[in-house]
Amino acid sequence: MNRIIPPENLPELLERAHMMAGVSLAQIAAQRGLSVPKDLKRDKGWVGQLIEMELGATAGSKPEQDFLHLGVELKTIPIDSQGRPLETTYVCVAPLSNIQGLTWQNSLVSHKLQRVLWVPVEGERHIPVGERRIGTPILWEPDPQELQLLQQDWEEIMELIALGKVEKLTARHGEVLQLRPKAANSKALTQSIAEDGSLKMTNPRGFYLKTSFTAMILNKVFG
C-alpha cells in the first residue's frame, strides 16, 4: 500500500478533498488495497482513518493537528439523508491532572479547532459501509461567537475538573462542548484531581462537539 504524500499547501489539500466528493468508501478502499469492514461496531475509526490516509494526514494519534504544516485539523462527520450530523465529534483527550497554568489559548481543544476541514460521509446504518458516499468538504474557522461559546464551555468544564468534580460532569454540561468518558474499555484508568486536591484514579475523558453545534456549521454552508 503506497503512502500518500502530504499535501504541500492548502489549495492542494482542498483539491484532494473535493475530488473525493461523491465517491464511495469502497472505491477509495479498493484504490488503497484495503478491505471494507461489514459494519463499524469494532472498527469505529475506520472511516476517519481511510479519509486521513487518502488526504495524506500526518498526525496519526499524536496530539497535534492532522495537517500541522497547514494548520488544519481533519474531521469526518457522519450525516443522515437530510445532511444532519448523526453523532458528536471527538476533539481530543481532556487533561484531568497537571492543569495549573493551562488556559484556553494554549489548550489542545483551541489548537485543534483553529481551522477544521470537515468531510461529511453518509452514515445511516441501512447503507452498507462500502456504499456510503463522501460529501462536499467544508473548510471552517470558528467565528468570534463560536469561539466564545467554545472557550466558555472549556473554561467551565476545566474549572470543575480543577475542583475535583470530574465525576459530576455529564454530557449535558456545556452548550457546544461536552466531556465524556473516552475509553472503549471502562477498566482503563487515569489520574484526576480529587475534591481534596489529591490525585485519584478515574476513567479517561474526552472533549466532544455536540451535534447541535456541528449542525450549525453544516447549515451555514449547505443551508
Curated annotation (Swiss-Prot):
SUPFAM superfamilies: Restriction endonuclease-like (SSF52980)
Annotated GO CC locations: cytoplasm
Keyword list, A-Z: Cytoplasm, DNA damage, DNA repair, Endonuclease, Hydrolase, Nuclease
Record's subcellular location: Cytoplasm
CDD domains, A to Z: MutH-like
Main localization (coarse): cytoplasm
MF GO annotations: DNA binding; endonuclease activity
Gene Ontology biological process: DNA modification; mismatch repair
Similarity comment: Belongs to the MutH family.
Purpose: Sequence-specific endonuclease that cleaves unmethylated GATC sequences. It is involved in DNA mismatch repair.
Name listed for the protein in its UniProt record: DNA mismatch repair protein MutH
Species name: Shewanella baltica (strain OS155 / ATCC BAA-1091)
Gene that this sequence comes from: mutH
